[in-house]
């Protein structure tokens, strides 16, 4: 297919130009990190490298903010340095799938949704803590957001059902605004 050939040629030329100018983009750095932290076994399976295992021993916990914007490469990087395949669940992930904004960077909000669906609310090796209290906004704002998302967000559209568990509840007290 001509389009595929053109895309491959463009990729090769872009890589050449970046090498000539000693440039790396974010994606290049992710893939270089993969080469360092993963190795291929004889059977073709990718496993953590010795470097990844060294990091694994150093990291007691791995904190990830905005997890809903992670992509598969980042997930593989995190898996390589966390202890999950050793039975040590040491990742602390924070995110809100309703805020996923990096599809252009191949973000996979379904990674977040998978963990959201499988982690328990209490007890167990992987615990999910739902933060429903909003300390930033007045109730007029959270009420509006809740009403809008209740109408728009469904499992088929955003991967999450917007219900009482997903809603925001105002927790801060604000002084009354002038003109009310």
Task: Give residue ranges: language-model regions.
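Short, polar/flexible loop-turn hinges at active-site or ligand-entry regions and domain interfaces
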Residues: 19-21, 43-48, 101, 119-129, ...
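Short helix-terminating capping/connector loops at secondary-structure junctions
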Residues: 56, 86-88, 122-126, 178-179
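Helicase-core coupling region on the C-terminal RecA-like lobe
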Residues: 130-180
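Non-catalytic alpha-helical coupling and interface elements of nucleotide-dependent molecular machines
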Residues: 38, 64, 83, 117-121, ...
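Conserved helicase NTPase motor core
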Residues: 1-114, 130-140
């Amino acid at each position: 297919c001509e389009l595929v050939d053109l895309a491959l040629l463009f990729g090769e030329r872009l890589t050449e130009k970046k090498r000539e100018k000693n440039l790396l983009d974010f994606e290049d750095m992710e893939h270089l990190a993969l080469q360092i932290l993963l190795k291929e076994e004889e059977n073709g399976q990718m496993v953590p490298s010795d470097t990844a295992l060294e990091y694994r021993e150093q990291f007691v916990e791995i904190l990830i903010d905005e997890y809903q914007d992670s992509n598969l490469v980042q997930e593989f990087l995190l898996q390589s340095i966390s202890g999950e395949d050793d039975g040590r669940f040491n990742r602390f992930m924070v995110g809100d799938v309703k805020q996923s904004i990096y599809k252009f960077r191949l973000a996979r909000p379904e990674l977040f949704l998978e963990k959201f669906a499988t982690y328990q609310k209490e007890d167990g090796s992987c615990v999910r803590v739902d933060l429903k209290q909003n300390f930033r906004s007045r109730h007029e704002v959270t009420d509006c957001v809740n009403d809008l998302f209740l109408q728009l967000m469904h499992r088929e559209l955003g991967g999450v059902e917007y219900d009482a568990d997903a809603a925001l509840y105002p927790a801060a007290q604000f002084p009354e605004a002038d003109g009310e």
